[in-house]
Regions:
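Conserved glycine-rich cofactor-binding loop
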Residues: 19, 26-27
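Conserved glycine-rich Rossmann-like NAD(P)H-binding loop of the short-chain dehydrogenase/reductase
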Residues: 40-56
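The beta1-alpha1 cofactor-binding region of Rossmann-like NAD(H)/NADP(H)-dependent oxidoreductases
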Residues: 51-52, 72-84, 115
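Active-site helix of classical SDR
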Residues: 133, 169
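Substrate-binding pocket helix/loop in short-chain dehydrogenase/reductase
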Residues: 109-110, 117-122
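Residue(s) in the substrate-gating loop at a strand-loop-helix junction
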Residues: 153
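C-terminal helical subdomain
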Residues: 186-189, 193-194, 201, 209-247
């Protein structure tokens, strides 16, 4: 009985012993997710391109007693991704939770956008998910378990004027996530998607300014934590997150 208790995570830290990698974890939604998973007991790796923001986020995590590995990386580049995964595993251990959060917004009519705009947005919002997931999945297969949580958007469900490029990236992410879930469930790996509406920290600057009518980064982090703490016999395939008050 004592041995069972030793191997059972503390109820306040159900993710104890887990290692989470959060892309774009140096700011905004990603940082909130990293903090929440760390509070629940996970060791956390964060990455981003802004070294200053990365240092600040890492300091916040360390101040809370969270084991952390931070690394500057461009997740649209396969070489950076390979180094990120290898160094995370060397520092913290095998990755058991991957949160594909890195993303960007670019808005306006399709006919006013350039090929470079398209490439930049799709690389950041979609290619990065493919590259990081591909690098992490073999380790999860070896562990026979894992959670991949992709941060999408309600823009992956709804069209709106000026959203052509952004919506395309998020609709594609929905399809990729669904196929990954079917590919990997036989290995004990769960793939989930979180689709928030407007978030107060959102990069686009679109939407209402009234904070009571938008989500907070913490709201998204709470949904991610709920998915990561789900019992082993089930998974939440898709979560739609909306503010209570309509804009």
């Amino acid at each position: 009985m004592d041995r069972i208790q030793e191997n059972t995570p503390h109820p306040d830290q159900p993710l104890s012993g887990k290692v989470a990698l959060v892309t774009g974890g140096n700011r905004g939604i990603g940082k909130a997710i990293a903090l929440r998973l760390g509070e629940l007991g996970a060791a956390v790796a964060i990455c981003g391109r802004d070294s200053s923001a990365l240092r600040k986020a890492s300091a916040e995590l360390l101040a809370l007693g969270i084991r952390v590995h931070s690394q500057q990386a461009d997740v649209t580049r396969a070489g950076d991704v390979a180094g990120l995964v290898a160094q995370t595993e060397a520092a913290l251990g095998p990755i058991s939770i991957l949160v594909n959060n890195a993303g960007m917004g670019l808005f306006g009519p399709v006919h006013e956008k350039s090929e470079a705009d398209w490439d930049t947005l799709l690389d950041t919002n979609l290619k990065s998910v493919f590259l990081v997931s591909r690098a992490v999945i073999p380790g999860m297969i070896e562990q026979k378990s894992g959670d991949i949580i992709n941060i999408s958007s309600l823009a992956g469900k709804n069209a709106f004027a000026g959203g052509g490029l952004y919506c395309a990236s998020k609709w594609a992410l929905q399809g990729l996530s669904g196929c990954m879930a079917e590919d990997l469930r036989g290995f004990g790996i769960r793939v989930s998607t979180v689709c928030p509406g407007s978030v107060a920290t959102e990069f686009s600057g679109r939407g209402p300014k009234d904070p009571s009518k938008v989500l907070s980064a913490g709201d998204v982090a709470h949904a991610v934590a709920m998915i990561a703490c789900q019992g082993p016999q089930s998974f939440l395939s898709e979560v739609h997150l909306r503010p209570v008050r309509k804009a």
